[in-house]
Amino acid sequence: MSQSNSHGQSNLAKFAFNIYGTLSTNSSTPQSHEISPSSSLSSSRSKKQTSQYNTQDTNNNRLSYYCDKEIISLSQLNCSLSIGGYSGDLQHHVVIGGKNYLRLLCVSESQQRIISGINLLESKSIYNSRAPNKLINVNTIKTFADTIATGLSNGVVSIYKISPNGQSKVTGKYSDHNRTINSLDFIESENQLLSGSQDGTIKLWDLRSSSTKPVMTVQANLHSDPIRACQYSPHSAVRNKICVLSVHDSGALCKFDLRTKSGGKVYSPEKKWNLHTGPALSLHIHPEKELVVTGGRDKRISIFNYGERQSRNTPQNLINTYGPVVKVRWSTYTNTEETAEEFEENKQAKPNTLYNYDIACSYLNDDPTITIYNLGRKFIPKQIIHSKKPIQNFIWARNETRSRKIWTISKSSTFSSYNLDRLEDSDVSRPIEDLNNIAMTWDNNNDFCAVSQARYDYDLETYENGINETTEENFDAERNYSLGNEELIHSQANSLTASPVDKPQLTRSLTFNPASSFSTFSPVLVARAATGFLQNDSATSSSSIPNMQVSSSRPKLTRNTSQTTQDSSSSQFASVLPPPSASQTYSSPQYKKNNPPRFMNNPAYVIPVSIPIPANDEYVFRKLSSESLVSTPDGFTLVDVCLLNASVAASVGNNRTSQIWRLLAVSIQEEFESGIEPRRIYAFQPEAINKLPQDVQETSTNANDTLHAETTNSNFVESFKSTSTSGSQFGKQSDKDERKLQSKNSSGNLMDMINKANRTNSFSATSFKFKEQERKEDESQKAQSIKDENERASIHSKSAPISISSHPEDLDDENMGSNNSAALKFSPPSVGVSIPSTRIISSSLASSPKSVRGPSGVKSHISRSRPSPPVQTWLKQKNLEVSNGSAMASTSGLSLTLKRNKTNEEGDQLTKAWKFKSLLRKSLDYATLQGDIIFCSTAALLFYDIVPEIISQFECLEWLGIYIEVLQRKRLFVNAINVIKCATADIQEKLQKLYCQDLSLRFYCSNCQALLVNEKSKFSGKGEFGYWYCDECSKLQSQCVYCNEPCKGLAVTVGLKCGHHGHFGCLKEWFIEDQNTECPGGCGYQII
């Protein structure tokens, strides 16, 4: 029965391979000529193997494999295997482990497809297990030749042997650890194995022995300090010394010597260094030197020299990352195979081994990236791998082409391969390619520094081969490359009179002062090439400037605005530099003869600039950030908050900002608090004039036959209004109603101010038609029809339309057009303007100014003009609306004229330019251009939840993020926290993730600069434990400036400038009781 089952499985596998070979052209699946139909699978291979081949993804020639269970660990097996049916010799394979999962994937020579998969959990074993289906968790994997060692979560170490035909066998199981095994490593051969566990011990196993007990147990302390990683060092300078390094949860790096005589147990390391303030999670030893790289939860990567002759206790290099580092690894191969275009080198390895190898690291907290650094430029990642899912583990992969490949496994149970040498891979970014050569930043004192650095100016040390000579032909070629058609530059550079003035080299101890520079010729921008071509030797040129280094590997920095640099040492030799290179330095034979090879350090040009900008006043910024309201207190409205912010801005002299806040307050009151719907203005339709009723036109014409036709027809409403306001009780009552309406609603004041400012330009012959939408929709149908009929009756086809206002005072003011027309008799028809009745109008054509309420021409004009009954009915209706408080504010003819061109032919609705949303958007745009971060942030905090369509979430986060950074830089931490507290819920959640994280405080000794951990006295029980002393140098850290006693716990600092501090009680006695104003340390610092 078993034979028939195995025969059926074999036939199924043959059939599946035939399908994949004939139906698929994908390079990741086996082809028909690679696996024959008669190929067979081992019985240890999974029954689900054939179904998993379909999940292989080879987009962009990337190897990908999906696992059906959760995977945690990853390693590479480098041994020769012969898979049945495949003619090639497979050398590099993938080993993946996880929860009840352990599989060996055989990869092709090109590492672009998976040939076969072997389930190692079904391997033959010499150990008889009563629970074959027991759940295991493979936490770590280590390989050596044909041996695979796995560390399980239950503290068991399992050893697998792989035969050349792909068969696997369990050869050993060792269980002496009490907790999870975190790290494994072989010692020079497959017979000795190291295991580091969470129980704080490192055990050495002899795999040739039949005993299941460890040969040696190593422990860092008497108490258990969990071991995160351990590794054997093959670079020991002492013969036969077995050196092992380990990192612990305490952040310590320990060095052990396994040549012990203490009976196989070591309880203290040979050396110990505290490199991290939190748990150290990973380590990896350099492939060539006694250097180790460690990564920890403190977001730091430390490169430390653990050699015998070194005595320093601090890392040799530090890399600050953007997340907690869970794994860090040196690259397998050097960078000698990289292209010359990327590093501006001719495939020559750097002599410093630190720069030959890259460093890759992955992060905690579900970060989907892997960052690659190089110590040649450690502050900027060299490459970043972006994955769709969080990265679980990774390794540098060995391959036949010695290319830089990284294998990864993600939390989505997917194995992927990334080739860092392929430029077309979209998931691998190169941040250095996107950086600008010039950058600028501000400091705490409102000064800024500009940095100018070429892209490939690595911070490299000297080359061992010295400085190479350059022939005359190379100089000619370089001149042609850098100059091209610049004959003007070439001609001026070859004359002594036009040579540039020598400038001293920029150093970090001096401040660059552009005002003291000489006027020099600024050539056209070329690729940072020197322009000196003087071939004459001049002793005064180089000797006049002290400390001049003529052989700088980078051209001197000029003091003009051009980025082209000029070499001031042209009297010694002539050179033109191509784009800056880290591997070549051009010099003359004379210079090489007189100067030996020296260090080639290419620092960036840092230019500190101090400009007294009035807007950067410290007092103004502090007052505005502290007193401006960013939220609405209880009992206040938005209008009150805007007015208070306006007063704060006015108190520091920011008058424009103050006026903007007041304008926003008026617009808020008009739109949100007045309760009046906004007026809607529609474009005038000329054909509506021809459709007016004939009886309305005849009535209006007969009522005004005693005056000139044009004057009377255009101003008969104003004449009637003047009669009513001068002699009737109705006019007096309308004045009272108008004043009540104006006191109730302030929105009309804004319109009147606009009309007053533009009254002299409000006369126009353009026709307009008004359609007013009333606020109350429950009016009777009869009143509505009467109003519409009277509106149409007020328009004449042969004259300009009449601007009818709901304010009696405005109608009285518009009579000014009638007076002028009656006096001049030939003036053109006009449109009424809202002008206060107490004003005196002066016309440029009249002989003297005339009062609007003057009795002389007004009464005679009114006595000859009476409005028609339809007009009286319309006016009564409008005055009734005024008394009820439901009238609309009038709109001047100037506003309509300005908006006339903004309407389309369909008559779309227009929006007021002084609306709140429009004013807010314009104010924010202007403040953004001016760099007013306080106004932008304050407005975003106040109005983001009110008008989210005006202030986007991206803008709000950007403004508030910059504002918080500036506040923290200026040490205004209370204001920064207040900004976060006043933000809306969605914004506050994102800001807290960025700016409210836990602080990591590191204390260093002020004498020996060692990290204060004081582990020697921590468990001794002698005295009070703390960080006010140092175990390394046995010196006190801080003493009270008043009583000269140690400051244990809380200490008060006198001032940030002097730095003296002391006990709270001592300083209270000195300053408050004794009423002293100077620092008790004698530095002369005044606190008041």
From Swiss-Prot:
Zinc finger map (RING-type): 1040-1083
Subcellular location: Vacuole
Keywords: Metal-binding, Repeat, Vacuole, WD repeat, Zinc, Zinc-finger
Sequence similarity: Belongs to the WD repeat RTC1 family.
Residue ranges of the region described as Disordered: 26-56, 537-597, 709-751, 764-829, 844-871
Gene name linked to the record: RTC1
GO biological-process terms attached to the record: positive regulation of macroautophagy; positive regulation of TORC1 signaling
GO cellular component: cytosol; GATOR2 complex; vacuolar membrane
WD repeats: 131-170, 176-215, 222-266, 275-314, 367-417, 432-473, 502-546, 631-671
Disulfide bonds, paired cysteine numbers: none
Function, in words: May be involved in a process influencing telomere capping.
Matches recorded under Pfam families: WD40, zf-RING_16
CDD domains: mRING-H2-C3H3C2_Mio-like
Biased segments, Polar residues type: 537-560, 582-593, 709-732, 796-806
Biased composition (Low complexity): 27-44, 561-572
Stretches that traverse the bilayer: none
Domain of life of the native organism: Eukaryota
Keyword 4Fe-4S attached: no
The protein, known as: Restriction of telomere capping protein 1
InterPro entries assigned: WD40/YVTN_repeat-like_dom_sf, WD40_repeat_CS, WD40_repeat_dom_sf, WD40_rpt, WDR24, WDR59_RTC1-like_RING_Znf, Znf_RING
GO molecular function: zinc ion binding
